[in-house]
Amino acid sequence: MEASKCFGPRTLPIIHNVPLCLKTNFSLFPCRLLQSQSLSSKKSTKHYLFRVKAETSGDLESTRPLTYFSPSYWGDHFLSVSIDDSEFEALEKEIETVFKPKVRDMLMSPHSSDKERIRLIHLLISLGIAYYYENEIEEILHKAYGKLACLISDEDDLETIAIMFEVFRLYGHKMPCDVFERFKSEDGKFKESLVGDVRGLLQLYEAAHLGAPSEDIMDEALSFARYHLEPLAGTETSSNLFKHVENVLYRARYHSIEILVARQYISFYDQEEDQDETLLRFSKLNFNFCQMHYVKELKIVTRWWKELGIASKLPYSIRERNVETYLGGLGVLFEPRYSLARIFLAKLTLIMTVVDDTCDAYATLPEVQSLHDAFHRWDLRAMEELPRYMRIIYQSVFETVEDIDREMIARGKHGRLQLTIDEIKSLMIWYLGIAKWARSDQVPSFEDYMEIGTPSSALDDFASYGFIAMDDCDQKQLKEWFYSKPKIFHALNALFRIRNDIVTFEQEMSRGEVANGVNCYMKQHGVTKEAAVEELRKMERESYKIMIEEFMTSKAMPRQILVRPVNIARVMDLFYKEADGFGHPDQKLLQLIASLFLHPIPL
């Protein structure tokens, strides 16, 4: 199994010599964290904005817009979380020798119909264990899609059709959306008889999130399903199904990361009358196994960040978010085999967040220009031209990239970091452009703003950090595809830029950052904030659809690569659903983190 490869005695020899398997007692709950306060009782921190005078090396007096970011809630607490090696190995053995082969037999049974297999695949996805059977699933769906017309010709069950639609599209088969026309009346509206089919409506709601541009029926399906499900979510009942409806309406499956979907679905499935005991136990074992896997990785990232100590060396506040950043990477690559990719992704994102905070909320324009020039040289000697505090940042970025490169070379993987270096250089171009607007109080047109604001979202950079340690396709082919600036990443970056600008609008305006998407749209079109946000939400939805379309139809890369941008979009809702949860994490996010990393599922 992959864990043996990821956590064997020869694994990660260069990453700070941190052993991944610690011979300690089994305890996944950090008592120190909650001795003085509970997750639900911690008081929120007020964030004060202020400006201070500063002089550059050229005697240029300027004002620095300083933002106080709340300190990390978690700090280095995960270093004290204990993992029992024997428990970890026992979980791995039971999964590998008992449940994997048993469920494979269920999936490949010659006695199952195509529809039964597709429903089983959907259940495996929901429970977070489909990744064990990627090849089998792709083979099953390839054959089934070839006879789609026959499969759906007489099918009038809404739940079955919606499940087929979701599963096929999730694996790159663009099942036509007109399949849902059969559920409409002559007046062109969805039949009222569907209102009583709660499971069908719920599945329709989930499937509608995989709609592509111009598929109006999927927008109609989303509105129809939500309208009729919302009254059920508000019902005071102990119904397991209604509680599940409430959870889904708060955060739909494709607005949540896969491991969180699995965590919540396992709890729901545990209370279902028709549960399959084999699948239920397998999913529980797998979640607990993954949780221990993740905590081991979090220890590495936390120790590295603590030893780097960059926050204490800088004269301003930065977002110290080692746990939250790791969570973001986990949302992109949750399968255990991507352990190294998650660690690299977390390290690079953390250090580049420092660069972002510096350019965004501290550095003068000449300093941003100097940092831009230094990164384009990509040479430690370039530090000589930087202010002292920027030398710390530049050296930290440079050495982090070099350390990862040495790690990959030690594994026989050469030239993996050039893509990352090129992306860092490109990102600095966008940061410089935004800094020029911000320091001049310039409000560009919305179109001009998005031309720079979209690539500055840097979610293609984020993805590239994970690609370093992935072997799902030829690296040369991956680089060529990435350098071609795929449409899927443009849509993803636009999606994030709009979402981010909406939730951070007041915060950015309060510190004088007038180049914000909402503000640019308001000024250009002479509309209120509410009207601007409404229009931007439409653009956000359209960008999401374009991303889904590209995921389903692109043949340039294998699914294991194309699904990563989609997964990044799923991460967004965790941090930017209602506010800036990355800059200022709230109680919901803290509790979510605890559920994923600190609370195993009872067996």
UniProtKB/Swiss-Prot annotation:
Essential cofactor(s): Mg(2+); Mn(2+)
Keyword Amino-acid biosynthesis: no
Pfam family, one: Terpene_synth
Sites where the protein binds Mg(2+) 2: 356, 360
Keyword Ribosomal protein: no
Any one GO molecular-function label of the UniProt entry: terpene synthase activity
Residues bound to Mg(2+) 1: 356, 360
EC number of the protein: 4.2.3.-
Residues noted as binding Mg(2+) 3 in the record, renumbered to the chain: 500, 504, 508
Pathway membership, UniProt: Secondary metabolite biosynthesis; terpenoid biosynthesis
Taxonomy, superkingdom: Eukaryota
Notes on the domains: The Asp-Asp-Xaa-Xaa-Asp/Glu (DDXXD/E) motif is important for the catalytic activity, presumably through binding to Mg(2+).
Name this polypeptide is given: Terpenoid synthase 25
Organism (species): Arabidopsis thaliana (Mouse-ear cress)
Name of the gene: TPS25
